[in-house]
Amino acid sequence: MAAAAAAVNGSLDRLDVHERKAQKSYWEEHSGELNLEAIMLDSRAAELDKEERPEVLSLLPSYEGKSILELGAGIGRFTGELAKTSGHVFAVDFVESVIKKNGSINDHYGNTSFMCADVTSTDLMIEANSIDLIFSNWLLMYLSDEEIDKLVERMVKWLKVGGYIFFRESCFHQTGDTERKFNPTHYREPRFYTKVFKECQTFNQDGTSFKLSLITFKCIGAYVNIKKDQNQICWLWKKVNSSEDGGFQSFLDNVQYKATGILRYERIFGDGYVSTGGAETTKEFVEKLNLKPGQKVLDVGCGIGGGDFYMAEKYGTHVVGIDLSINMIMFALERSIGCKCLVEFEVADCTTKTYPDHMFDVIYSRDTILHIQDKPSLFKSFFKWLKPGGKVLISDYCKSPGKPSEEFATYIKQRGYDLHDVEAYGQMLKNAGFSHVIAEDRTDQFLSVLQKELDKFEKNKDDFLSEFAQEDYDDIVNGWKAKLQRSSAGEQRWGLFVATK
């Protein structure tokens, strides 16, 4: 047994040596000219950098006076920006000419230090619990899976509790147009990185365990704007005590919207959709918005992105889709690859997310805001984010006026919903400042759509069971029948709301 383990370890070590040689050779070839185009491997580097660099910096937590470890620092595209307000930046890169160039550009800040080292090397010794922010941009894609596993564990140990890790990678495929003799880059699916970081757990000397909590996960908007490419993806994680509850996001991803659960829902709602009526109601409702090419749309609770792709492809709009569920955004990003449209996705909590005033022409939300307890505050945010003349369109679960039955109240509590009657819902939009508020009870349409979805689903039972279990089938059928019963009884309602700023 021990001999077998030693043989496996020896084999991995040889693979790691080969990996490091290949990556070093690759970067020595592409760092002959120490300029932006060479480092970004793209002829449009200057154009991309102008939009992308401030975007990346805007995604970071406050680092004023903080200690920053920058891994794979390159010629210092971010080093100088970080040094302007941080306490100290320790920049590391494994190509000597590159890190020397970085030092010559950024040493004058007086709070920077530079080291030529490979991040996988044990020679890189950082004191435990000493770093506030670990930053890397295009680093992990040049490491093997095994090297990433080891590095993540070390990074978590280096971080202070409450400290952050930010990293950005090229996923799925190459983006830069620079010609390459060979390319050892690992263009992974983003779910690989999410899994590795999410599952990492470390312990301090007294046995207390720590994990990483996901704060942000999104594609870089600059690459969507300029190249219509969603493969540039970044993550922001926070080091927390392992006993910390994951909150509502954890409930969504582990209970209501597990990966298999999302795929189940998609089978009844239709390809790309996880909300009532799928493509049919999307087309009907979106038509009410009079969308024009170039307009910017925010989709709150975007799910797996079907409605966003539809708006971007049919109307030429730029759509920003946000959802609290990591699983939803993971599917949306995977499906965006190759679409070549202006759609970007982000894991975000709409109750804490901020946008500049007057940023969007339309805010769109389908059967999502039922999860939000403080709707008045959210609607005030919507009002601020919209341009004058902008529209909001919301479909959502509602209830009848008055006190719900004991059974319906239990259902609402179990799901964590906050439901209002249609009139009260519309009044909240008016109170937030909106004009021309249309509040329609669409329960009859809801019943019709539910029945149509159920009939089609039952007809395709054998097809569904070829991929899913009988239990999954029963859950869907029973869930739809229960919704039909609650809505037929007049308890559960479905509202459509359109309003203008």
Curated annotation (Swiss-Prot):
InterPro entries: Methyltranfer_dom (IPR025714), Methyltransf_25 (IPR041698), Phosphoethanolamine_N-MeTrfase (IPR025771), SAM-dependent_MTases_sf (IPR029063)
Residues noted as binding S-adenosyl-L-homocysteine in the record, renumbered to the chain: G72, R77, D93, D118, V119, N137, V274, S275, G301, D323, D349, C350, R366
Catalytic activity: phosphoethanolamine + S-adenosyl-L-methionine = N-methylethanolamine phosphate + S-adenosyl-L-homocysteine + H(+); N-methylethanolamine phosphate + S-adenosyl-L-methionine = N,N-dimethylethanolamine phosphate + S-adenosyl-L-homocysteine + H(+); N,N-dimethylethanolamine phosphate + S-adenosyl-L-methionine = phosphocholine + S-adenosyl-L-homocysteine + H(+)
Catalytic class of the enzyme: transferase
Keywords annotated in UniProt: Methyltransferase, Transferase
Residues that, per the record, bind N-methylethanolamine phosphate: Q256, Y257, Y265, Y397, Y411, R415, G416, Y417, K483
Pathways involved: Phospholipid metabolism; phosphatidylcholine biosynthesis; phosphocholine from phosphoethanolamine: step 1/1
Signal peptide (from-to): none
PANTHER family, sorted: PHOSPHOETHANOLAMINE METHYLTRANSFERASE, PHOSPHOETHANOLAMINE N-METHYLTRANSFERASE-RELATED
Family as reported in the entry's similarity comment: Belongs to the class I-like SAM-binding methyltransferase superfamily. PEAMT family.
Protein name, per record: Phosphoethanolamine N-methyltransferase 1
Source species: Zea mays
Gene name tied to this protein: PEAMT1
